[in-house]
Amino acid sequence: ENINKLNFQDHQGSHFAPHLVSKKIWNDVGGFSEEFNPGIASDPDFNMKLWKKGVRIFKGLNNFKVYHFGSITTRKKKNFTQNRGDRTFLKKWGMTTKFFKKHYLKSNTKYDGPLKNPKISFKFIIGLIGCKIRSIFTI
């Protein structure tokens, strides 16, 4: 009943899960990458693969609501080692997930059509250099 009172704008970026992607594009980019299992940073990695493929529409829909059960696949496992997905993403793509979402996906901004390549600004370059330095010191 209260769910209908929630009102968000369509936004740039992605809900991250679930995704609506054609089977051809899914197969072309290889779907989710196993190195991110059980899911930490698997969505940004998938979105980066889509970006590299030339996809520029990443749209979160206002009237689409998802309840995330939160770590349901790992919550009850004993001796579970948490995936270091953010580190894996940094090593794989040379930038943090936060940088990718901010500068490429423009996450959480109002949807206004297909995305463009990031604007190369002083702030962008400093942020990217910071990612590269962080990558060097990340194990």
Positions of predicted regions on the chain:
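Conserved donor NDP-sugar-binding/catalytic core segment of glycosyltransferases
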Residues: 1, 36, 56
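Hydrophobic residues within well-ordered alpha-helices
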Residues: 50-51
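Acidic donor-binding loop at a coil-to-helix junction in glycosyltransferase catalytic cores
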Residues: 39-45
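Short, hydrophobic alpha-helical packing/hinge segments within bilobed ligand-binding/sensory domains
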Residues: 17, 46-47
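A recurrent flexible, glycine/aromatic-enriched loop bordering the glycosyltransferase active site
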Residues: 2-24, 28, 76
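Active-site donor/metal-binding and catalytic loop motifs
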Residues: 37, 59-78, 88
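Active-site phosphate/pyrophosphate-handling residues
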Residues: 24, 45, 88
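Non-catalytic, C-terminal membrane-associated alpha-helical segments of glycosyltransferases
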Residues: 80-84, 99-139
